């Protein structure tokens, strides 16, 4: 049997860290994409082509990681809701409101 030792509020607070991490990663990727464009305007040749290829291969992986963090945030919030609902249901068994 699973045991969660955090309150729903604590779980929700921790979930925000994942959402913030996702936002930060997306901002970093945006900044790097902009920098990549500036480099592309000033660097030609085979070396840049390889550099660009690596960047293009990496970008979707970084975006996928940001999406995963957002999904974790949502899962934690859903877990917090379930814990809160379960606690409320159990308290009703004792006539508590």
From Swiss-Prot:
<keyword id="KW-0843">Virulence</keyword>
<protein>
    <recommendedName>
        <fullName>Type VII secretion system extracellular protein A</fullName>
    </recommendedName>
</protein>
<dbReference type="Pfam" id="PF06013">
    <property type="entry name" value="WXG100"/>
</dbReference>
<comment type="subunit">
    <text>Forms both homodimers and heterodimers with EsxC.</text>
</comment>
<keyword id="KW-0175">Coiled coil</keyword>
<comment type="similarity">
    <text>Belongs to the WXG100 family. sagEsxA-like subfamily.</text>
</comment>
<comment type="function">
    <text>Virulence factor that is important for the establishment of infection in the host. EsxA is required for EsxB synthesis as well as secretion. Modulates host cell apoptotic pathways and mediates together with EsxB the release of S.aureus from the host cell. By acting on apoptosis, plays a role in the modulation of dendritic cell-mediated immunity.</text>
</comment>
<keyword id="KW-0964">Secreted</keyword>
<dbReference type="GO" id="GO:0005576">
    <property type="term" value="C:extracellular region"/>
</dbReference>
<dbReference type="InterPro" id="IPR010310">
    <property type="entry name" value="T7SS_ESAT-6-like"/>
</dbReference>
<dbReference type="InterPro" id="IPR036689">
    <property type="entry name" value="ESAT-6-like_sf"/>
</dbReference>
<feature type="coiled-coil region">
    <location>
        <begin position="61"/>
        <end position="93"/>
    </location>
</feature>
